[in-house]
Every structure is written in C-alpha cells, then in structure tokens.
Amino acid sequence: MLESAPFARLPTPMNVEQARFNMVEQQIRTWEVLDQDVLDLLYVVRREEFVPAEYRAFAFSDLEIPLYDGADEGERMMQPKVEARILQELAVKKNEHVLEVGTGSGYLAALLAARSHHVYSVEINPKLKAFGEENLRRGGVENATVQLGDAAQGWRTFAPYDVIVLTGSTPILPQTLISQLKVGGRLFAVVGDPPVMEARLITSVDEGSCYTTDLFETCLAPLKNALQPARFEF
C-alpha cells in the first residue's frame, strides 16, 4: 500500500529527469519496449503531471498508483511499462481515431493523442472524468475529447475506430467492441479473471473477421459493467 503525505514531494528538477530516465531505461526498455518513438514520447509527456498530488513522489515507480485519495472504486494508473507496451503494440498513426475506454488520469490519452489524429476517451466515474479532463487541459492536449458514459461494451457515437484501448480488464471481450473497429483496426484488451489475465491485440482483417495475438500476462482491475460470461443453472 502506498503512503501519500509526507512523502509526496517530488525530487529536485534534476532528480526528476534522472528518475524519468531510470523509468525508461530500467523498467520500460527492459520490458521489450524498443520502439524509439515510444521511448522518446515518454520524455515529452510528463507523467508526474497526471499523478494525484499526494502520490507524485511515485510517478516513475514500477507500480499502480491510486488515482485519487480515498478512492473506493479501486481505480489506478497502470504501471509505466504496461502503458508503453500498449503504445508500441498498437502502433498508432497520425491519421487514426482512437477510442479509449476508461480515461483515468488522462495520461494514456495524452500519449495516444500525441500519436493519433484524435482520441475519444469515455469515463464512467464523474470524479475521474473531471480529473482526467483537467489534466489533459493543463497538459495542452487539444485532440482528445473526454465524455462521461459507459463504454465497456462499445461507444457508437464516433464509431468506427482505427484503434480501441480498454484500460481495465474484461472477463470476455464483447463482440460489440470488435464490431466497432475499422478494417485494419486494432484493439488492446486485458482479458480474463484474476489471477490469470492475458493482454491481447485483436486486429480486424475484414468485416466480421479478426485475429488475436497474445502479448503478455498481467492483471488489471475490471472495467465497471464489463461483460460477464453466461452462467448456467442446473
């Protein structure tokens, strides 16, 4: 469990940059993130500015960070290495439109926005929607739209999308989400139940057809209202 105050103060500016360098070189690069464009972006988008004030001393740590003090929903920022792998595996292009399911702090949305034409981020928690939106505004991110709603099984408003990212896990992947991908589109999701979950990349080949690549094992808190498997009664 993280302690916040009195250990929340960031180091001096020089040490902040050293901590960022260590995060990239020791955590992220060693986790098979070798795309130099992704690594460079992690120096540009300042992670510490998206972390709640009481946890900023942990901004570059290899752990999940609570998104606001006293959170009763369990929302957390992903580990930096997971965020970086997501960026690398999705290989987002500048002309692409992205759906992010779960805004959280807004940090991943900012990273995605730097590589895409526009990010549509949907957050079910009003407090986190406001938190993430304000972080994006302060960060000068103009090509990300944050909306309040439930996108765990899709978001038709701006569909279809080139890229879809789920920032929480889902026991099974809804077909409605896959159907909102453009041909050639990619979807990142962590699928399964604890303690065994698999990060997967789903690529749309043509209408109604896709293939799945298993990327790595991890464990994320589930999305609210994530699709559950059918339960049979005897």
Label each residue range with its predicted role.
Residues L2-L99, Y107-A110, R115, L128-E142, ...:
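Class I SAM-dependent transferase core
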Residues L87, A91-Y211:
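Conserved nucleotide-cofactor-binding alpha/beta core module
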